[in-house]
Each structure stands twice: as structure tokens, then as C-alpha cells.
């Protein structure tokens, strides 16, 4: 029973942390781009699914993961020995021009969007379904209630490198 409770707490925390930071990062980025905000104002429910995936791609809450090589390998011409640790830069992968058209631009209608903001494979975020659910409910609800929402001042980022998010975001409604 104790393991079950611990697993539930892990899932809730993983989903909550991912959704809070993805939502905050994505909303700030969108609020700074009038053409993207216009899409949300006009039809928040119509762009919710693609918008939340773009939030994860454009400014994911986690940009850096440490990984350990399980076999000797080579990546981009660099030899990596079994047991060696590497830093996987998710933020960089989500801006790969060979995968994404106009990768440095936010596009809330981007589809397909094969981002790895939630990780991939065996390292896929356990909280991803909860994060997607929370964002898919809150995004249209927020825009329907506050359609004139705008940034009131420059948001303040948390002073961390790995888990990206904001300490405060002041908005006007």
C-alpha cells in the first residue's frame, strides 16, 4: 500500500510540475507574440491541443537531462564509452531545423509537432498525461474568462538552470 501511495504522489507531482511550468512558459511566450495571442482569443478551444504541444516544444520546463551510456557508441562524431555520462539538451533538440520548420518561432497551430519536451522512450515523463489534461482544461477556460489578458510587466524567471519556470508573471485582465 505504501508503494502505491508513493507512486500516486510521484505521478501527481510529476504532472503538476510539468504542467505548471509548461503552462507558464508557454503563456508568457504566447503573450509576447500578438499573432499567436490572436489565435487563442479567437478560438481557444480550437487550438488547445496544438497550443499545449507547442508550449512544451517552444520552452519546455526541463531542457537538460543527464544520461549514462549503456554501450560504447558514437554521436555526431564523438565517441562515448559505456558508463560515460552525457547531457541531453532537450531544448536544443526541440529547435532542430531538420525536424521543425521555423524552429525558433512559436506556432500554436504546429502539426505535426514531434517535440521531446516530455522526454522519449524509457525516459518519457510519467506525468505527461496529467500535464496534458490540466493544460487542455485550463487553457481554454482561462482565455474564455479573460479574453483581454496581457502581460502587465516583464515576468521574472526563477534563477535555475534545469527546471525552467517563472517566479512571478503579472497580467492585466
Language-model segment annotations:
Residues 1-173:
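Cytochrome P450
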Amino acid at each position: 500500500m505504501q508503494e502505491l501511495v508513493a507512486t500516486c504522489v510521484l505521478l501527481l507531482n510529476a504532472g503538476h510540475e510539468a504542467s505548471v511550468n509548461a503552462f507558464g512558459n508557454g503563456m508568457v511566450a504566447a503573450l509576447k507574440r500578438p499573432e499567436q495571442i490572436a489565435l487563442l482569443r479567437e478560438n481557444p478551444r480550437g487550438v488547445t491541443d496544438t497550443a499545449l504541444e507547442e508550449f512544451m516544444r517552444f520552452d519546455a520546463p526541463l531542457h537538460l537531462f543527464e544520461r549514462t551510456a549503456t554501450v560504447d557508441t558514437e554521436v555526431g562524431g564523438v565517441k562515448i564509452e559505456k558508463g560515460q555520462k552525457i547531457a541531453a539538451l532537450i531544448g536544443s533538440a526541440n529547435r532542430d531545423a531538420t525536424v521543425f520548420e521555423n524552429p525558433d518561432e512559436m506556432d500554436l497551430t504546429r502539426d505535426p509537432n514531434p517535440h521531446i519536451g516530455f522526454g522519449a522512450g524509457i525516459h518519457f515523463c510519467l506525468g505527461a498525461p496529467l500535464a496534458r489534461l490540466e493544460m487542455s482544461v485550463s487553457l481554454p477556460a482561462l482565455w474564455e474568462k479573460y479574453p483581454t489578458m496581457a502581460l502587465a510587466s516583464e515576468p521574472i524567471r526563477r534563477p535555475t538552470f534545469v527546471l525552467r519556470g517563472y517566479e512571478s508573471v503579472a497580467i492585466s485582465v
